[in-house]
Amino acid sequence: MNLLLLRPYYGITIFSDMMGDLGIAEYLPQVLPDLSLVYAATIAKNDKSVKLDIIDANAEKLFPKDVIKRMEKKYDVIILKGASPTIKYDIEFASYLKNNNYTSRIVLTGHTAKLLKNWISEHAPEIDDISEVPTEYYVNNMLGNKLPSLSIDAFPTLDYTLFPYDKYSLITGELRGSLYMSRGCAVGCSYCPYASFYGKKFDFRSVDKVIDDIKHLLSLGFTTLQFRDQFFTADRKMVFELCRKIIEQGLKFEWYCETRLESLDNELIDIMVEAGMIFISFGVESAEGDTLQSYNRPVYGLERTKGLIDYLHEKNVITLAFYIVGFPDETWDTLQSTYNLALKLASKCAVFNIYMPSLKEEELKEQYPGIEITPDLFMPFENTLNLKSAKNFSLEQMLELKTQLSFLYQANVPEPDALQDAFENHLNSSKKYVSAVKSLRSKLEEVSIMDI
């Protein structure tokens, strides 16, 4: 079988496996791997019946016409990984590849493709299949279920050598790789995209296999690793075991993780820092406790939350807090309360995102009667839906607010050169990105993706 795994590119960098595999657009000049594709490729590589090609156009900045030039043969199967910010163009590209006889079978994967399966089947019937499961599961099933189970603990040691891994770097130029110790989350926040794609459960990878993944990445020259777990410290015992083995085996690297802040304490933070943690992110979301509880989101206690953030800073860990704006009943008063909370907690960084409802069709239609799930629901090159989520604000106001709040926050952080940093790395970069997105969207309304 001649198989091509393809991550496309249309002019804007996409982190296609983030946000529960919906994908996000990235305005900074850095590229990260798609872990789902890395595992899919590793599984396929181990099957002797497969002749595997991989084109990570997102990493190599290859437009669709460049991808066509790179392809040297007709494939039996092309699997194209879609993402919310580009799904309209992903469908167009997949259709082009099939209609122009570059493949016998075209498959579209990713969370957004799953959500649009009915629409795609009706409006783009040339696309042979739309996966309803993660890409690596689809590949495993297609090859006859080579893995003993679909747990991430059954996955082989990921093989980055199949990809242009030298492109996976931070804006500083350092290589940054991604890996899992766990996937999924059992907490059950109703707006969480991870639960709707991976299920409301935890799936753990054994510590020894995680160590093998780390050693593989270090052998390739990666100096910074990001654990892509949605709740890294969900199993306290496993985190202690992992950190102890990193320390005992003398594995030297810096790492990032995301977790729920209330699961931390000083003892756990200490060993994580000793093992190399330099950056941690977590969701605070809103100052409105009643709002959070209505979405099944546990509420942090202010004093304990502030104490943990302060202790992380004492340990020289960079903290990033996520906040949500644009809940259906959002007002200027609730926005002000959330912004004031962010200032009180004083994480080193803060990101304000627009509320995204559950994308399960029955729940979405209950909240927004008459809505249809089509590609137009997903704004090109934006990390939000084309949807007025808040009764008191327009979508345009929300898009502007999320940028301005992030700028204002960074300008108020008590750090040297905070205002300059906020202007150069937040406001200025965001404005350049917004300008580029508007220009690209306008162009793609007039021409085919093959003409960019």
Identify the role of each PLM range.
Residues 2-5, 25-26, 46-49, 70-77, ...:
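Radical SAM enzyme core and accessory elements
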Residues 40-52, 220, 249, 275, ...:
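A structural motif corresponding to the C-terminal end of an alpha-helix
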Residues 117-124, 268, 329-344:
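Catalytic cores of alpha/beta
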Residues 2-220:
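Acidic, low-complexity intrinsically disordered segments
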Residues 60-64, 240-246, 331-348:
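Short, electropositive alpha-helical surface patch
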